[in-house]
Amino acid sequence: MTIRPVTPDDLEVLIDIYLDTARHHAAIDPEVFQVPDRDAIAVRLRRRIEGRGESGEYVVAMLGDVVVGSASVDIADPPSAGNMARAVPTAEFGVSVVEGYRGHGIGRALIEHLERWAADHGVERMILTVSDANEGAIRLYHELGYRDFDRMMLKPLTRP
């Protein structure tokens, strides 16, 4: 497996990976997740590809000529003055592995790549958001040394 930076030529396969990931999330937690429109995804990912720079990395994992995953990391802005959060250089990341390739070390390799990139850019702490229903990903993150540190809560509201 090789990991390389994304290029504009990767747009279509990145859209497919995003759709695959959206379907996975919608299946495990349909109250929260949906499968977005392909054109809207294209706009979002095109901006992401064009916006790469020193404050982030966006890569794909390749098995031969096949893209089997993608991952990105972005260095977060420091907390504003008066914020209770410690001003530790932090980066947030996300990983997607194509169904059928999950559980084979691709996600782990992508995360380790992002961690090296972040450390080389002065980052001291990595964070991510993961659905409670995504048990496989949570297991991997724990194996890699990530710990639960915060909780986001959700309550659907109904109109009277």
Q: Residue spans of the language-model regions?
A:
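A short beta-loop-alpha structural element at the N-terminal edge
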Residues: T2-D16, H25
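Conserved GNAT-fold acetyl-CoA-binding loop/helix
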Residues: R23-R46
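Conserved beta-strand in the GNAT
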Residues: V60, V66-I75
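Conserved catalytic-core motifs of GNAT/GCN5-like acyltransferases
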Residues: I75-S80, I127-S131, E135-I138, H142, ...
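Conserved acetyl-CoA-binding loop-helix of GNAT-fold acetyltransferases
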Residues: G94, G103-R116, D120, R139-L144
